[in-house]
Structure formats: C-alpha cells, structure tokens
UniProtKB/Swiss-Prot annotation:
Belongs to the adaptor complexes large subunit family. It is a peripheral membrane protein. Signal peptide: none annotated. The modification Phosphoserine is found at S675. Residues 629-649 are annotated as: Disordered. The keyword Transport applies. GO terms for molecular function: clathrin binding. GO terms for biological process: endosome to plasma membrane protein transport; retrograde transport, endosome to Golgi. This is AP-1 complex subunit beta-1. Keywords: Cell membrane, Coated pit, Membrane, Phosphoprotein, Protein transport, Transport. Its main location: membrane.
C-alpha cells in the first residue's frame, strides 16, 4: 500500500510539461514560489524520478538567507552527490562560504554535503573547513565533522592521515558532548577496520572512563556505538574488566533491544576472566533481559533466539529449566517456532522432561509440515539426551505410525535410525510396523534409514530378506544414498544369516554395483565388499561389518573455538548466521561507496576497450593507403603455398585478411602465389 504522504497531488507522475513549470518556479522573484518549486522537485526526487536536469536552477537557490529553502537545496544536493558528483562540485564555493556562517546548522550542513561529494577534487576544498569544524564551538558541527573525516579517509587515506585529521578525531573521544563522543568512536572504529595494522583505534583503560560517562548520557544509537567499542577493550587485569562490566550491567534495563544485546556482547567478551561468583552474578543479571526480548516483534525475537542459542551453549544453566517462555505460540511465525524447538531441546533435563514431552506431543498434531518434522526430530534428540523418556518417545513414534501420514512416517523412520543406534534393544517395538511402513517411504533419507535398520537388525527381523529384496528390485532407480545403504545392508544380512537366498541377493547387488553402475563411490565399496566376502576372509568380514557400533549421544553444540568467536560477534550477522564474518563477507568490508567506485572503474575499463577497438577499426579502413609492394608478397610461382597460409613476407594487415580466406578445396594441387591486392579483392 502506498503511504498517504505519496498519495498527494505533489507525488503524481512527473510529466515533461512540469519541467518548464518547475524551472520558472525555481527562478521566480518570489520566495514562496521558489520554496514551493523546490518542494515539488524534492517530492519528485523522493519517488525516484530523475530531476537532475533542474540542477542549475536548484543551485541558484543555494545563495539564500532562508534557512528552510537552504535545507531543502542541501537535501537535493546530498541526493545527487553520489550520482552526479561533477555537478555538485560546481557549488563548492557556496559550501565553503556556508561553513563559516554564524548558524551552526548551516555550518554542519555544508560540511556534511561536502563529505557526500565522492570525487577527489573536493578534498582540496574540504580540508580547511573540516579542520575548523572539528574544533567548532558547537557540538552539532563537531558531530557532523567527525563523520566527515571517515568520508575523507575513504577518498584519500594518505592525505587524511598526513594532515592530522586522525589525531583531531581521536581528540574528540574526550569531547564533553556525548553525541560527539559517539560519532568520533564510530568513525575511528570504521577507519580502524579499514587499516587494522595502523592501530588508529585501540581502546585502553584510560579511555573507558570517558566512554562510560558518555554511555549514560547519549541516545540508543550512541550507546550501541560506545558498547561496541567497549567490546574491543582487552585487558589481563581482572579489576579493570570487572569495572567495565559493572558499569555496563545497567544497560540491560534499556528499552532498545540493540542496546541490550550490545551490553550482552561486552559481558560475554570479558566473562572468561572472572571468578565463578562474579560470573554467576553477571549471568543472573543477563537472563531476565534476554527473556524480555521474546515479547517483542518477531524479527527481534529471531535475532534474540539465535544469540540465546549461543549463550546457552556456553552456559546451559543460565535460565530456569522450568520456564515456559520458549514454548511455541499458535501465532508464532514458522522461523520462530523452529528456533524455539532448538532451545527447548537444549533445556531438556530430568527436572522438566515431563512438561517438555507433553508440549512436543501437542506440536506433532500441528498443521505446518516443516514444524511437525522438526518436532519429531526434537523428540529423537530428547530421547538421546534424557534416557528416562525413551519409552515415551517411542510410544509417540508408534502412534505416528498408526496415523499412517506419509511425511510424518518418513521423518519418524529417519529419527528411529538414530534412536536405535543408542537403544538397539527397542527394535522389538518396531517389528509389527516394518512391512506396512516401507510402502509409505519415498524420501531418500527415510528409505536409506529403513535399509540400515533392515541390515543392522536382520538377525532379529524375520522378514528382513524379503523387504530388502523388494527394495533392491528398484535399486537402479534409487538415489546414490539409498544404493549405498542397500549394498551395506545386504552384506550384513549375508554375514549374519548366511542363507543361500541371501547369498544370491548379495551377488545380485554386487553385480549391479560393479558392472552396471557408473558411480565410482558405489563401485569402490562393492569391490571392497567383494574381496571381504571371499571364503578365507569371512571371519574378518564379520568382525569388520558386524562389529559393535559405538553409542551415539546428543551433541548439537558448535566447536569451542567457533563458539567463542561468535560470542564476540553478538549484534552482528555472524551471531545470527552462526558463521564467522569472513565466511560470508570475504576478507574485507565494502561499503556502498567502494562498490560504486569499483563500478566506475569497470565502466572506464570498458570504455577504454571500446576506444581501442575503434582505433583498430580505423587502421583496417586505411588498408588501401598501405604500401603492398613488399617483395615477399610477389614471390615466384615456383614457391607454392596454400591459400589458408599467409606468406612470410606479408605485413600484419595482410595476415589479418588472409586469415579470413576460405581454404583450398584441392590440397594436392599447389596454388600460385597471388599479390596482396588480389587477396584484398578476393574478399
């Protein structure tokens, strides 16, 4: 739906006839007409219409004493600064003049607009006004100047560093105004990320006092910036780290979720240094704010749940195990439900297992297919994690088999493979359902799991040979995953039972895998089994294939090193993806300006290639002006050559033309040498 702001007549389609009308309004002698024309121009610009043709007329209104009009013109200039920087450079004298105005708003606007012009020419004009703005008496100007230093550094790093702008920016960290401090910290952090080896922003203990003072006085954006800078603070002194964390703890009560998670980040970075008592105190303070985030919008809930997942892996006892806040609500989006199921599984223990099983049993009857599948998987994980409820979980699985709903039956079969690896004695409960279940299996994962069950427990399942034979009859049409499982299953069947029919089944599968299959993995495994199944190796094969399998356990945690790295990336995409930043953003961070510069470079390269092609074309057109009287081109007729092979004495232009000449149809008969002019006319 289009917002009401854009439904007014001002935002209707921008017609060509309106251009002349706006031009007249922009140069009107009446101020109210000029203001109205600028507003209409910006309205058209806001909805994506190209009004850059009005740039000269809009620029004329820059030299005005009307603050409202000047702000509108600056807004127009900032919008076109990235796409039309060469036009904006025309107004640089006005920018420099405005940077010395008595009004701090105008001074800040001038500095901000000059920083938005992304051409190297602007640096010479920007340097002196920016140097003055960094020491301006008004904090609003200093705040804008701090951000402008980053933009200058992005344009020319050497110039910015050699002219003392970095040192002036570092001095702003001690500014009495908290907003200026926040902007200075953010700018230094961004500069440091571009050149970490130069160490422009290293947070030390002497800096933390000023940051703490600013932390309690600035808005939420400033707090997030300062908290992220405190997360950069590294120390081996426990007292210093405790002081920082104690000052950060009150930020847990902030209403903004970004501030809360940034405070959590600071705590998690420093918490390995502390004693168990202080660690317990910090986790106790951290838990309620994290749970409060689950009552916010769904998008914030998702980010909170992904970060809670990481914290739970580090500290499983942070929450009360009987809390119901992680139970799924009927109106939760699917992505929230999926994350909550993971948390429920992580919190499952003997104290809350009955309530957890009852809740998961209720989820099985939901209508969302993916949610039900994930619930069944969670039931299997709970069975592995809490052995006391294995009978309850298998009872739920058998109830699902009774329902005979295809996708549920298939997911249960996949889970049962894992459950039976730890509880093989429970296979007896599954026996009455195997013949009926196998007909419902279409998912490759489920069919391969069923093949594993039939092979692993072939000595217990009376119909294992028959069921495997039915699956093998369609082996050629199965996925590789199923073919590998069937191959292993029939080998187990043969080694455990040793019946004649089973031997025939094994030979049938081996023959297909070795002689008919084109997959190298399947053939290699078949060759290995074929050598193992020779009479002299039967006992060795039984020890290898039918050996006792190691018990499985529930472990869904990330590697310790990866977990510690991700806990230091809370409030970033890395903590949501559960991946290190370099795995999805590359080795460097690229902003919109860097991408735009790269696009311009590619356009310049393409344009240079076009010019080069045009120049080559011009040379070809001037071929008739060349001197073709080269002796090699008129060689004696007794020196036969083929028409497809240029003469050694011809020049490069003639080589080009003769390369396009059709080859001779009679290679046995030598072709007389022709002059270069004949070759040219022969085209």
């Amino acid at each position: 739906m289009v917002p009401k702001l854009f439904q007014s007549s001002r935002f209707k389609a921008f017609k060509k006839s309106e251009t002349s009308e706006l031009q007249k309004g922009l140069v009107s002698q009446y101020a109210y007409e000029r203001i109205d024309a600028v507003k209409r121009t910006i309205a058209a610009m806001t909805v994506g219409k190209d009004v850059s043709s009005l740039f000269p007329d809009v620029l004329k209104n820059l030299a005005t004493r009307d603050i409202t009009l000047k702000k509108l013109v600056y807004l127009y200039l900032i919008n076109y600064a990235k796409t039309h920087p060469d036009l904006c450079i025309l107004a640089v004298n006005t920018f420099v003049k405005d940077s010395e105005e008595y009004n701090p708003t105008l001074r800040a606007l001038a500095i901000r607009t000059m920083g938005c012009i992304r051409v190297n020419k602007i640096i010479g004009y920007l340097a002196d006004p920016l140097r003055k703005a960094l020491k301006d008496e008004h904090p609003y100007v200093r705040k804008a100047a701090a951000v402008c230093v980053v933009k200058m550094y992005d344009l020319d790093r050497e110039y910015c560093a050699s002219n003392g702008f970095i040192e002036q920016l570092q001095a702003l960290v001690s500014d009495p105004n908290p907003v200026v401090v926040a902007n200075a910290v953010r700018s230094l952090a961004e500069i440091h990320d571009q050149d970490p080896e130069k160490g422009y922003f290293n947070v030390v203990y002497t800096m933390t006092d000023r940051l703490m003072v600013a932390l309690s006085e600035c808005n939420e954006w400033g707090r997030i910036t300062i908290l992220n800078s405190l997360a950069r603070f590294r120390t081996s002194d426990i007292k210093e780290a405790e002081y920082v964390c104690e000052r950060v703890v009150p930020q847990f009560q902030h209403a903004n979720s970004g501030v809360v998670l940034s405070a959590v980040k600071v705590i998690m970075v420093h918490i390995p240094l502390f004693s168990s008592d202080f660690t317990d105190f910090l986790y106790k303070k951290m838990a309620p704010p994290l749970l409060t985030l689950l009552s916010t919008d769904s998008e914030i809930q998702y980010v909170a749940l992904r970060n809670i997942n990481l914290i739970l892996q580090k500290r499983p006892s942070i929450f009360d195990v009987k809390t119901r806040v992680f139970f799924c609500k009927y109106n939760d989006p699917l992505y929230i439900k999926m994350e909550k199921l993971k948390i429920i599984t992580m919190l499952a223990c003997d104290e809350n297992i009955n309530e957890t099983i009852s809740e998961l049993r209720a989820y099985v009857s939901e209508v969302e297919l993916e949610f039900v599948k994930q619930t069944i998987k969670c039931l299997g994980d709970v069975a592995l994690k809490v052995p006391s409820v294995i009978n309850d979980c298998i009872s739920i699985f058998l109830e699902i088999y009774e329902l005979n709903i295809s996708y549920m039956v298939q997911e249960v079969t996949v889970v049962m493979e894992t459950v039976l690896r730890k509880y093989p004695q429970k296979i007896d409960l599954l026996l009455p359902y195997l013949s009926r279940v196998i007909e419902e299996l279409g998912d490759p994962r489920a069919r391969s799991s069923m093949a594993w069950i039939l092979g692993e427990f072939s000595h217990v399942i009376p119909t294992s040979s028959k069921l495997l034979s039915e699956m093998i009859s369609t082996m050629a049409d199965e996925d590789l995953q199923i073919q590998l499982a069937l191959l292993t299953a029939v080998v187990k069947l043969s080694l455990m039972n040793g019946k004649g029919n089973d031997e025939e089944l094994v030979q049938k599968v081996l023959n297909y895998a070795i002689n008919q299959s084109s997959n190298q993995d399947l053939r290699d495994r078949a060759f290995a089994y074929q050598r193992l199944l020779t009479p002299e190796n039967v006992r060795k094969a039984q020890k290898i294939v039918c050996c006792e399998k190691p018990s499985v356990s529930y472990n869904n945690n990330l590697p310790e090193a990866l977990l510690d790295a991700l806990l230091c990336e809370i409030t970033t995409l890395a903590s949501v993806y559960h991946k290190l930043p370099e795995s999805f953003i590359g080795q460097g961070k690229f902003g919109a300006d860097a991408i735009q510069r790269r696009a311009v470079e590619e356009l310049n390269i393409e344009e240079a290639n076009v010019h080069e092609a045009i120049e080559k074309g011009a040379n070809v057109e001037n071929l008739l002006d060349l001197d073709f009287t080269d002796p090699g081109a008129t060689s004696a007729s007794d020196s036969p050559i083929t028409s497809a092979q240029p003469q050694s004495g011809s020049n490069s232009a003639m080589d080009l033309f003769m390369a396009f000449e059709a080859p001779s149809t009679n290679n046995a008969e030598p072709v007389k040498a022709r002059s270069a002019t004949d070759d040219l006319l022969g085209l």
